[in-house]
Regions:
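Short, hinge-like loop/turn segments at secondary-structure boundaries
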Residues: 48-53, 151, 189-193
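Single conserved hydrophobic/aromatic residue that forms the stacking wall/gate
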Residues: 210-219
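Rossmann-like dinucleotide/flavin-binding elements
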Residues: 4-5, 10-36, 128, 134-183
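FAD-binding core/adjacent interface of flavoenzyme oxidoreductases
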Residues: 1-11, 27, 79-145
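Conserved N-terminal glycine-rich FAD pyrophosphate-binding loop of Rossmann-like flavoproteins
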Residues: 37-60
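Short beta-strand to alpha-helix junction loop
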Residues: 53-69, 178-182
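A Rossmann-like FAD-binding core segment of flavoenzymes
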Residues: 69-90, 95-96, 102-103, 166-211
Length: 219
């Protein structure tokens, strides 16, 4: 099996990994990126980005990530498609094991992303980045004068729904239980004219045409 030595090995080819590689490569450090799949990850699956500084036109996440990767490679980064199955970081030289070869480096950077949460309803993975979003601050402007749904009764869901009321014509707030009456933020949200509250309800699925919202009985 091939053994490749370098100064830095970066696991993950997303924006964090590519940014790190750009800096290390420009510092004349021999750098290798090991990327399982350039088509997955939070940025790669994002359908449209309109708030990235320095990019004046809407761009897909996949295209933006390609530009980041190409810039790192331009300065000497060795980009490789590889699935990491083992790491030994106990010694001075860090060792990373893949089916394609063994990589040794004095520095190891883990930039494997944060897409570990499993889908919670049918269609979530299919529409992620194409209508399903986890960031109202990032994507709220896309939903101006449109109907949008927010699922959840926790603090984060309340904050996201509140942000979306500034853009959407109607925000369908879907909660599996009734908000606590002493939660001032929740009560203010329910008083908002743009909010339609679906209490004791859970989201089963999404499709191109509708949401499936069965009312939960006795929950």
């Amino acid at each position: 099996m091939e053994i490749i030595e370098s100064d830095v090995v970066i696991i993950g080819g997303g924006p964090a990994g590519c940014t790190c590689a750009l800096y290390t490569s420009r510092s004349n450090l021999k750098t290798v990126i090991l990327d399982k799949n350039p088509s997955v990850g939070a940025l790669a699956i994002t359908h449209q980005i309109a708030n990235y500084p320095g990019v004046p036109v809407d761009i897909s996440g996949e295209k933006l990530l390609t530009l980041m990767r190409e810039q790192a490679v331009q300065y000497g980064t060795d980009y490789r498609r590889a699935q990491v199955f083992g790491i030994d970081a106990s010694g001075e030289w860090k060792t990373v094991y893949t089916p394609e070869g063994t990589f040794k480096a004095k520095a190891l950077v883990l930039a494997s992303g944060a897409m570990g949460r499993p889908a919670s309803f049918k269609g979530e993975a299919d529409f992620l980045g194409k209508g399903v979003s986890y960031c109202a601050t990032c994507d709220g402007a896309f939903y101006k004068n449109r109907e949008v749904a927010v699922v959840g009764v926790n603090k984060e869901a309340i904050e996201e729904a509140t942000v979306l009321t500034k853009f959407a014509s109607t925000v369908h707030w879907i909660t599996s239980s009734d908000p606590k009456s002493d939660n001032e933020e929740a009560m203010e949200l329910m008083d908002n004219s743009n909010i339609k509250h679906w209490s004791r309800t859970r989201l089963l699925a999404v499709s191109y045409t509708h949401l499936t919202l069965p009312t939960m009985i006795g929950v």
